Amino acid sequence: AINQALKIEAPKFDKKKFEKAVDYALTLTTQHGDFYPLIRKAFEDAGVIFVILPNLPGSGINGATKKIGQNVMLMVNDRRFYSDTVWFTLFHEIGHIINGDYGITFENEHAGQEDAADKYAEDKLIPPGEYEAFVRMNEFSENAIRRFAERIDRDPGIVLGRLQNDQIVPFTNVALSKALKHKYKVITS
């Protein structure tokens, strides 16, 4: 990832521009085909070099951030590249950048910085007040999840992934996962 990032010319990292690029990225969660080049360009304009790499089996690595000169590298891999995991991993790594901490994120790692990045991703992807109101309704059918996702302008797989992570909907509900989680295939060249 670092080698790829070093090949890319980008302006100096600008946190305010990056925050605007992050808000733009949120608008792309329902665009399954072309989001990567759009986000990559918006981030690059803010000094963040966004790289997607193939998974290294057995590594347990989901993503990483690193300061490289005057830029920041943001890497995610294509492991479990479904709508819920790709967007959560991306926004988790964005959380590290916004919080000013950099490094590698391993699966099932929980510490202060990791928890803060998780919270950032959760709150950016699904507004907390709206999520709490949706959960209180206690209706988690495919249609209910789709309606809520449409209302907050997010991919329904993101909502389902959050419900599963919060142990509200079981991961064993394969039919719901197949119906709502989009599988991405990103061409990175």
Name every feature range the model reports, one short phrase each.
Residues A1-S189:
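Active-site hotspot residues in diverse enzymes, especially metal/ion-binding acidic/histidine motifs
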